[in-house]
């Protein structure tokens, strides 16, 4: 590449050297596109109105963001729990203490923070499967991915988590007794939980 300059009469020298195209605009455009795609993907969780969350959209979101996390169905988990042998997994409830206090899966232990979750998993053999769950599977998929990065194997997320489990009429416990309610997490996410499973106080809060 060489410079080409010309003197125009009565004016300054003009440089016609070819200029490499700047990459700033393409990079900026690509960044905006990626952000836009992520925003659109997240919006697909909602169908129609902001409160109309669908299960299919939630499952798609989880698969998109945590494809490395294996999913276990509520049916398979129930079968493993009933077998009561080495296939019975360690159940970790990663919701808040308040949510866990309303109800949880039988035998599940509560561990909300990353350190608590890691500590709970270390107390069991590496050969024992670990199943984590939350309300619908978003928080627990994130927790499962973190456990896997720490080196833990045989980790699963409960697909649909406690909402789907309860919607199917499967057993729930609280303070050692069977219950039939689940913390709805929030008004928006609570639409995925059958209305008869909402605690009375939660229903009042949503009115």
Residue ranges and their predicted role:
Residues 2, 9, 23-82, 101-128, ...:
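Rhodanese-like catalytic fold shared by cysteine-dependent sulfurtransferases
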Residues 133:
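Short, surface-exposed ligand- or partner-binding patches at beta-edge/loop junctions that are enriched
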Residues 1-19:
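N-terminal secretory signal peptides that target proteins for export/translocation
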Residues 89-93:
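Structural scaffold elements adjacent to functional motifs in cytosolic proteins
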Residues 137-138:
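Residue-level detector of alpha-helix initiation sites
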Residues 94-99:
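Short, polar loop motifs at secondary-structure junctions
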């Amino acid at each position: 590449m060489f410079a080409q300059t010309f003197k125009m009469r009565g004016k300054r020298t003009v440089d016609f050297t070819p200029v490499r195209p700047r990459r700033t605009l393409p990079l900026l455009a690509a960044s905006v596109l990626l952000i836009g795609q992520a925003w659109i993907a997240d919006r697909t969780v909602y169908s129609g109105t902001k409160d109309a969350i669908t299960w299919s959209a939630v499952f798609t979101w989880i698969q998109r963001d945590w494809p490395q996390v294996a999913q276990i169905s509520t049916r398979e988990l129930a079968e493993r729990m009933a077998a009561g042998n080495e296939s019975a997994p360690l159940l970790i409830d990663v919701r808040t203490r308040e949510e866990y206090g309303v109800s949880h899966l039988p035998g599940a232990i509560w561990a909300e923070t990353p350190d608590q979750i890691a500590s709970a998993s270390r107390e069991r053999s590496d050969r024992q499967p670990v199943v984590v769950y939350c309300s619908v599977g978003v928080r627990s998929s994130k927790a499962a991915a973190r456990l896997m990065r720490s080196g833990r194997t045989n980790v699963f997320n409960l697909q649909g988590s406690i909402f789907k489990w309860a919607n199917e009429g499967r057993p729930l416990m609280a303070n050692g007794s069977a219950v039939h309610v689940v913390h709805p997490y929030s008004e928006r996410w609570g639409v995925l939980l059958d209305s008869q499973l909402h605690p009375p106080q939660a229903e009042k809060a949503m009115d």
